[in-house]
């Protein structure tokens, strides 16, 4: 997990003994990914690259973390991330994704979560079988334990209403959620995409939203099919006065402890890349 540092609210500068930036001891990563929907009762078509994308999301983080800051070479800053949860296909059940236990191997143990699978108008779609189904924002209180970020590699997670209103029931301590208003598609360039995301956010010290938007512009669906496009988005939790918005934080300015964000949604940002489909 991550250790505490102090964020100076006026200067937005991190104070750490012997180093102007504090390094997290570790980032615990968890993934839920579904390719084989037939094993989950069907109801929708199978996918081809989501399990691989989940693996690449973790291993790309492992390649750049530790040593995220420009002040340190990659691999010199702290312990490597842990892959605390790797649920695939039939393992991605309603009970698994909604479980609020913060013990190892559960969703709320993980600092950063990844979901790769079908989305359906601001909900997760796990399959038509018993024990799967549609997971609504009210079913998945994010951040009751250690979860602080979520990246959804799925269609329409910010479609179907105003994101800050629709996702309000899910924000229970999470800082920010990344996803798409548009359709998203299987992408066999997920290593390049997620490596670009982690490098942008950590080593290049871009904001969370720009790290995601730029990675999608370079290696998202438009890169494979130039006539198409994407609309990625970032939804932040409400932030206290004099604090930078969580979607606009570079990783070096993140408060590296377990303190939950305010249990309210804040600003939503999006970017149209090419010609998205909805």
Locations of regions flagged by a protein language model:
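Bacterial N-terminal signal peptides that target proteins for export
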Residues: 1-7
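Bacterial N-terminal signal peptides
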Residues: 9-16
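Sec/Tat signal peptide C-region and signal peptidase I cleavage site
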Residues: 18-22
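A domain-level signal for caspase-like cysteine endopeptidase catalytic cores
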Residues: 23-115, 119
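Solvent-exposed loop/turn segments at secondary-structure junctions
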Residues: 34-39, 117-123, 154-161, 181-188
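Mature extracellular/periplasmic domains of secretome proteins
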Residues: 94-110, 131-145, 164-173
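A short, glycine/acidic-enriched catalytic loop
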Residues: 119-149, 156
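Active-site-proximal C-terminal subdomain of hydrolase catalytic domains
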Residues: 156-278
């Amino acid at each position: 997990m991550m250790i505490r540092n102090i964020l100076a609210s006026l200067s937005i500068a991190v104070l750490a003994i012997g180093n102007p930036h504090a390094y997290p001891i570790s980032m615990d990563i968890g993934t839920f990914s579904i390719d084989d929907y037939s094993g989950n009762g069907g109801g929708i078509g199978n996918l081809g690259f989501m399990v691989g994308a989940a693996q690449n999301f973790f291993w790309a983080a492992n390649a750049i973390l530790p040593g995220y800051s420009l002040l340190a070479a990659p691999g010199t800053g702290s312990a490597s991330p842990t892959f605390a949860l790797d649920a695939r296909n039939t393992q991605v059940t309603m009970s698994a994704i909604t479980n609020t236990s913060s013990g190892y191997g559960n969703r709320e143990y993980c600092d950063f979560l990844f979901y790769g699978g079908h989305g359906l108008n601001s909900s997760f779609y796990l399959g038509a079988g018993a024990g799967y189904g549609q997971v609504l924002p009210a079913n998945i209180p994010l951040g009751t334990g250690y979860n602080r970020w979520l990246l959804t590699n799925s269609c329409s997670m910010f479609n179907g209403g105003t994101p800050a209103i629709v996702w309000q029931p899910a924000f229970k301590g999470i800082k920010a959620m990344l996803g798409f208003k548009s359709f998203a598609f299987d992408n066999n360039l997920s290593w390049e995409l997620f490596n670009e995301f982690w490098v942008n956010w950590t080593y290049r010290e871009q904001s969370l939203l720009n790290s995601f938007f730029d990675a999608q512009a370079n290696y998202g669906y438009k890169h494979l099919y130039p006539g198409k496009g994407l609309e990625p988005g970032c939804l932040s939790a409400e932030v206290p006065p004099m604090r930078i918005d969580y979607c606009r934080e570079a990783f070096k300015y993140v408060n590296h402890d377990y303190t939950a964000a305010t249990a309210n949604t804040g600003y939503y940002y999006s970017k149209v890349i090419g010609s998205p489909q909805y």
